[in-house]
């Protein structure tokens, strides 16, 4: 070890939350459940063409609730999700995203990256941002206000948000829907 000794104060406010609802399973049940999950996830893929089918708001809300169950640095849950269905707002998001995408696709320094994307047929035009019945916009929260109103840092923000989005994608998939992650930089 480094020879350093760290002394941690025992928290007087710490109260462990008992884990309830645990079902003890046999090895064969565990294997079966893991195989079922694997087979379900093998069917997951992104799409760029969305149907006009209405999806109830409650479905999207429940998927976001699943994302909210993701583990996070210091259990801060440093994310915020916004649900967008308003056509005017979706058009504004599309226009802003396409402006950024045009810069990306015209940047000669990104030639290798663009060649890697070529088999997927991606381009600067993002009609799916208007066509999808819902857009879910994820925001990372690097800081939050504590109970005294002071700014306090959140920890492992990119990792925590990434895990939450992974939960969200899985929830969307398990409802029978599909999604596409879109990450225009610097949006």
Would you name each region that the model predicts?
Residues 10, 80-162:
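Glycine/small-residue-rich phosphate/adenosyl-binding loop
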Residues 76-77, 129-132, 172-175:
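Short gly/pro-enriched beta-turn/loop segments at secondary-structure junctions
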